[in-house]
């Protein structure tokens, strides 16, 4: 038995001894394969015109894929060549082209392109370097991600980028630095119709975390809590579906106010779903289905906040004008008018951004372009252009909602104060009434969209790069709107009483239909008279 254990111990030591040995203080993305390189007598390797000393080589049995995970591969030798000479990362062999999201099978020996690139040094100066003569081309690294899109600066100023001496890339449109793990370079046929190719950067189509807001906050994407927003948003949609179903099922919510609330919930749920589609890059950029998703998403966002304003106005009118009987006689026409106002206004705003996209050039220097479908299947919200088309309309509607909320709560407070003077209630009655008032104020605050006011503040903070905790807090509040609405409207004794009553009425109706197989003569006469 002891001999058996000794054999296993020796085997374990042997396995440890032959394990892969990474190069100390060398990132995997600064290495190249040396499988076909010449090995010198002193243990060094010659890679192109660079001699890599033995201490900068190591045995690897893995590669790092586009998700950052280690993937087991046959053991091979790698050298940390980027410590000796400036490296440039290509997606494939420098004589190949990208075919979709993969490298082409063919090597184009006659492929020619501009081999000189502008390289930004650490001190900020820009020098020109020849790709093949002045740098080491890394072309054996795994592709940086599953799906890519090219930054073609020749055709769009939105696609401007700068390459740095340390191998990182600066993307101009969102002012972001990308490591070599997040991009690669490759010749690409020019889209101007001329018969030559340019080196362009292929960067990743991100799969960002499932957060609400509208896919803009970098600090939320980088937050440790960002993954927690995925189940929160799914839960939010789930609870909104329950709330919508309850409003459709219960007769009480077939009133004017109930119909308006339900349309608000439906628009918000659709907005959530379309936003999810845009965040996950399900559709290819600049395709008809991508444009359709972006414009439909903008339409539902505007409709959501317009219905919220309608609800706020309707609640205020119910309290402030309830003495006027004419208000109660025109509910059907009011609902029709509300629909006309909401859908036509949302449609008009959507038409405006569509026309601007068609006739205004997409340019980073132009702050008036919505850029729907350019960077994601959504309106561009990472710059100040979002102020004109997105946050300005929302800010106006949110301010109107807050004003309606203030006027409504003030009216309730003043009226209750007058009632207390008239009734001269005892202390317990006053306390009970105060608790009831607080519940009313809270529900009004939720229904009238008071929490959305943080959305505008958070956008300004994001643009000015300040108060990041507030931005994250706002994003999670917005992400859980469906849960908040469910708690505020569904979780109360009145709602449970209505559900119980509805179920009991259905049971009684089904029992009566079962026991009465044929109508009696008096019921037939009644039916005839009703049919007259």
Curated annotation (Swiss-Prot):
Residues 1-20 form the signal peptide. Disulfide bonds join 26-80, 82-87, 91-184, 92-103, 145-204. One of its GO terms (molecular function) is G protein-coupled receptor activity. It holds the Pfam family Methuselah_N. It is a multi-pass membrane protein. Residues 251-262, 312-339, 408-439, 491-532 are cytoplasmic. One of its GO terms (cellular component) is membrane. InterPro entries: GPCR_2-like_7TM, Methusela_ecto_dom_1, Methusela_ecto_dom_2, Methuselah_N_dom, Methuselah_N_sf, Mth_GPCR. Glycans are attached at residues 42, 110, 123, 166, 195, 227. It is found in: Cell membrane. Keywords: Cell membrane, Disulfide bond, G-protein coupled receptor, Glycoprotein, Membrane, Receptor, Signal, Transducer, Transmembrane, Transmembrane helix. The chain crosses the membrane at residues 230-250, 263-283, 291-311, 340-360, 387-407, 440-460, 470-490. Residues 21-229, 284-290, 361-386, 461-469 are extracellular. The keyword Secreted does not apply. GO terms for biological process: cell surface receptor signaling pathway; determination of adult lifespan; G protein-coupled receptor signaling pathway; response to starvation. Belongs to the G-protein coupled receptor 2 family. Mth subfamily. This is Probable G-protein coupled receptor Mth-like 11. The gene is mthl11.
